[in-house]
Amino acid sequence: MATVIAKVKVMPTSPEVDKESLKATLKELVENNDAKCRGVSDEPLAFGLYTVFVMVEMEEKEGGMDPIEEAMNALENVESAEVVELSLV
């Protein structure tokens, strides 16, 4: 099977959400879903808001990134999470 690399864009609910805590939570979530976190970064958006990007590496399987994406969307301080890039290695 091939290895999948995905870039997930995560939007926090507000500028008051602690950036470092959110990044740590996202990394832990990825690793608890049989995947590897290859990096977490943030970029300023506007008016104090920021976007968090999570690079995920996992083995190709049925359902793919859906369980991880759904778990990220279920987090309390996350407004939305979506896969913005996906490639096979």
From Swiss-Prot:
<dbReference type="InterPro" id="IPR014038">
    <property type="entry name" value="EF1B_bsu/dsu_GNE"/>
</dbReference>
<comment type="function">
    <text>Promotes the exchange of GDP for GTP in EF-1-alpha/GDP, thus allowing the regeneration of EF-1-alpha/GTP that could then be used to form the ternary complex EF-1-alpha/GTP/AAtRNA.</text>
</comment>
<dbReference type="InterPro" id="IPR004542">
    <property type="entry name" value="Transl_elong_EF1B_B_arc"/>
</dbReference>
<dbReference type="Pfam" id="PF00736">
    <property type="entry name" value="EF1_GNE"/>
</dbReference>
<keyword id="KW-0251">Elongation factor</keyword>
<keyword id="KW-0648">Protein biosynthesis</keyword>
<dbReference type="GO" id="GO:0003746">
    <property type="term" value="F:translation elongation factor activity"/>
</dbReference>
<protein>
    <recommendedName>
        <fullName>Elongation factor 1-beta</fullName>
    </recommendedName>
</protein>
<dbReference type="InterPro" id="IPR036219">
    <property type="entry name" value="eEF-1beta-like_sf"/>
</dbReference>
<comment type="similarity">
    <text>Belongs to the EF-1-beta/EF-1-delta family.</text>
</comment>
<dbReference type="InterPro" id="IPR014717">
    <property type="entry name" value="Transl_elong_EF1B/ribsomal_bS6"/>
</dbReference>
